[in-house]
Amino acid sequence: LGMGRFRGGSMKIAVLASGLFGSVSGSAVANVVGTGVITIPMIKRDGYPAHKAAAIEAVASTGGQLMPPVMGASAFLMAEFLAIPYSTIVAAALVPAILYYVALFIQADLEAARMGIKAMPKSELPAGRTVIVGSHFVAAFAVLIYALFVLRWQPERAALLGAVALIATSLVFGYQGNRPSLKALFSSLSTTGHSVVEIILISAASGLVIGVLNVTGLSFNLTYALVEVGGGSAIVLLFLSAIVCIILGMGLPTLGVYVLLAALVAPALVKVGIEPIAAHLYVLYFGMMSMITPPIALAAFAAASIARSAPMATGWAAMKFGWSAYVIPVLFVFSPTLILIGEPFEITIAIITAGMGVWLISAALAGYFSTQLTPMTRLLFGLCGLLALVPAGAFEGAVWSDLIGVAGGVALMALNVMRNRLAVRSEEAA
């Protein structure tokens, strides 16, 4: 209802819906298939090219695996691996995930502006009551969050309380006059059990893989090889690790991706002094990027089959829309302020400048901000965005990079807004 009132509403609705569903689905491809059959035709109907409609769906669905509090169930395993509270994992993953979706929303908005796509017609917008009718189901989610972060309960105990709250609200309020029968409740429990069994099997199989890797020494050898080839350079090691993560992550569900990479790649990053939580989030991000990175971008290709677009064109468009996921992990590795490690003031500044950087780079990629951007202006937007993205604590003097990037970005934005207003006035005068 709210998104549809603005330009590019269909694409923004797809981003929101796929992100929410993807955070609990545990599979980017399953999320694309589940939500894409609705969102992709809706986006195409608004006038977007088929490959862009498929790409935005693939990127939004993949990002759901990185969005707290569930993160495709990988957050729970990460807490076990690192022996730290689950709430710490969720807090650390929150800002990077928000920046990911902010970049996606901005690109959706600017693409709509560049292509002249208007808001959805009022006749197609749902009535406000349609949204309000099911709002009581949010209570169960609120109970879950309260139990996890306020009461500090273990995830399994908090999930049980959330399930009880969901059943209670269903029985008391129902939905559109319908309340679940006892048979329907038992059927839901059975379906949930089947889903849990899949997760247990994946975790058990992953445990066997880790055991074999440790017994054979392959885990140690890969860690040693990465560190040696990297030659002590963190930048080279991060680049090599990203490639390994993308290759190993191809075709695996989220849990499988994380467990494999946490055992094989993360130790090499920790060995050179990278924060353990930053290292584990780094491998998770690049493992999930295998879903939108050609040549085997399974989520992008699944979306392409629904949109009937060219698979490779969809894959490259998905990489463009999902650019932030290739950059943000590198930033929080060099400066953990983006994962809320550091002084409150430094964290605040890092978040603000990163948000500005995301906006500028998204505008450069879209080629639009208030008006069409020339190639040189796009280059300047991108350069200022990169400078603003660098966290102040990344290296000595990085604060000047932030200041130059933000100041230059604000100046470019102001100039483009003024240019657009002058052009509009000239047209009106003519």
Model-derived features with residue positions:
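Membrane-interfacial loop-to-helix junctions in multi-pass transporters
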Residues: 2-14, 46-52, 132-138, 193-199, ...
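Alpha-helical transmembrane segments of multipass membrane proteins
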Residues: 19-20, 62, 73, 77-81, ...
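Hydrophobic transmembrane alpha-helices
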Residues: 17-21, 60-67, 99, 209, ...
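Hydrophobic alpha-helical transmembrane segments in multi-pass membrane proteins
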Residues: 10, 14, 18, 64-73, ...
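Core transmembrane alpha-helical segments of multi-pass membrane transporters/permeases
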Residues: 160, 183-220, 234, 238-247, ...
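Long, contiguous bundles of hydrophobic transmembrane helices that form the permeation core
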Residues: 91-195, 298-389, 422-427
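Hydrophobic transmembrane alpha-helices that form the pore/transport pathway of multi-pass ion
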Residues: 1-64, 74, 83, 254-286, ...
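Transmembrane helix-loop junctions in multi-pass membrane proteins
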Residues: 76-86, 149-153, 212-221, 249-251, ...
